[in-house]
């Protein structure tokens, strides 16, 4: 199980407990920290996908915006 899966699992456990009986202050703080971590991981993965995206028109020509190409060159993706 990856770290992201473990974070997601623990967030879900805390959510269920919150619905059933409520959370202690420590659990609520843990939930907030896990949520921040989850969002940061999601954003990093999404940004990586966008950074490696190549846009191609109907004729097969690369029409990726120049700004995206520059980012890809800096990260050695092109």
From Swiss-Prot:
Any one GO cellular component localisation term in the record: cytoplasm
Main location group: cytoplasm
SUPFAM superfamilies per the UniProt record, alphabetical: YnzC-like (SSF158221)
Taxonomy, superkingdom: Bacteria
Signal peptide: none
UniProt KW keywords: Cytoplasm
Protein name, UniProt field: UPF0291 protein Ldb1355
């Amino acid at each position: 199980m990856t770290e992201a899966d473990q974070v997601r699992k623990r967030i879900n456990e805390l959510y269920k407990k919150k619905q059933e009986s409520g959370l202690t202050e420590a659990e609520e703080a843990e939930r907030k920290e896990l949520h921040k971590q989850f969002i940061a991981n999601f954003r990093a993965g999404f940004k990586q996908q966008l950074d490696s995206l190549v846009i191609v028109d109907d004729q097969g020509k690369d029409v990726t915006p120049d700004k995206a190409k520059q980012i890809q060159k800096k990260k050695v993706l092109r």
